[in-house]
Amino acid sequence: MKIWKDIFTGDEMFSDTYKLKLVDNVMYEVYGKHVSRTLGDVQLDGANPSAEEADEGTDNATESGVDIVLNHRLVETGFADKKQFTTYLKDYMKKLVTRLEENNPSEVEVFKTNINKVMKDLLGRFKDLQFFTGESMDCEGLIAMLEYRDIDGESTPVLLCFKHGLEEEKF
């Protein structure tokens, strides 16, 4: 199993249990689904319910949302406007370029060439995006973007993460 973590915060962002697509060698698209699940619903294999004390029936809480967000404990955040988002992108890209120059100089030119197209595309879709930080809620790290796309007639959540802002870890 592989997990992708934010290079600045160490937060888990997603894993290879989801369908992944690398776009322009700079952006991962992670395809999720909307789920609902019961919290605190513990099933003991082999337990004999008739031999147990009567359950007084507690209200089971449910949570629903995008599986990637729930499973990796991503936290929704936001930007007041497109200008604030643009400022974040510019600052974050500077941090990524600096890190690439130090650790992977051969990737810098590809990154700079392809990221402009991707950023322009993201800014054009700003109103359709939701934004998520990792579990630490550190806004200095990667802020993932989520949008819904019509795939085969279904509304599918797609998480967008900058490839160079992630490190891959194998388990």
Swiss-Prot record:
UniProt keyword list: Calcium, Cytoplasm
PROSITE patterns per record: TCTP_1, TCTP_2, TCTP_3
Cellular component per GO, a single term: cytoplasm
Main location: cytoplasm
Similarity remark: Belongs to the TCTP family.
Function text: Involved in calcium binding and microtubule stabilization.
The protein's name in its UniProt record: Translationally-controlled tumor protein homolog
Lineage of source species: Eukaryota, Metazoa, Ecdysozoa, Arthropoda, Hexapoda
Gene this protein is translated from: Tctp
